[in-house]
Amino acid sequence: MQQLITEITKGQLKTDLPSFRPGDTLRVHVKVVEGTRERIQLFEGVVIKRRGGGISETFTVRKISYGVGVERTFPVHTPRIANIEVLRRGKVRRAKLYYLRNLRGKKARIKEIR
């Protein structure tokens, strides 16, 4: 049964994705439908988690907008994502960066990999 599921979902997986990890800063180009129009909206922030595998893999990006933390979870292989740009590579020692939710200002910075 599992082989059948992987065979069906294999054709729906995206292959043009950049490699990214928690701690990296991304710019996600999301297709947004407003009425009859479709436009691209940018969401830029730090990856705080990545979970799952295969077609159900998701990642969460966190940014601070007007002093309020905003987190958005995206499926990796959704057709709603037009493009993913990796802006910075972050050096972290955790897979889930939930501790960033409690940090403010300069303490919430992540070291960059040179």
Swiss-Prot record:
Chain segments annotated as transmembrane: none
GO BP of this protein: translation
Role noted for this protein: This protein is located at the 30S-50S ribosomal subunit interface and may play a role in the structure and function of the aminoacyl-tRNA binding site.
Family label: Belongs to the bacterial ribosomal protein bL19 family.
HAMAP family the record matches: Ribosomal_bL19
GO CC list: cytosolic large ribosomal subunit
Organism: Bacillus mycoides (strain KBAB4) (Bacillus weihenstephanensis)
Residue ranges the record marks as coiled coil: none
Keywords: Ribonucleoprotein, Ribosomal protein
Alphabetized GO MF terms: structural constituent of ribosome
InterPro entries per record: Ribosomal_bL19, Ribosomal_bL19_CS, Ribosomal_bL19_sf, Translation_prot_SH3-like_sf
Family matches, as PANTHER family: LARGE RIBOSOMAL SUBUNIT PROTEIN BL19M, RIBOSOMAL PROTEIN L19
PROSITE patterns: RIBOSOMAL_L19 (PS01015)
Name the UniProt record assigns to this protein: Large ribosomal subunit protein bL19
Matching Gene3D superfamilies: 2.30.30.790
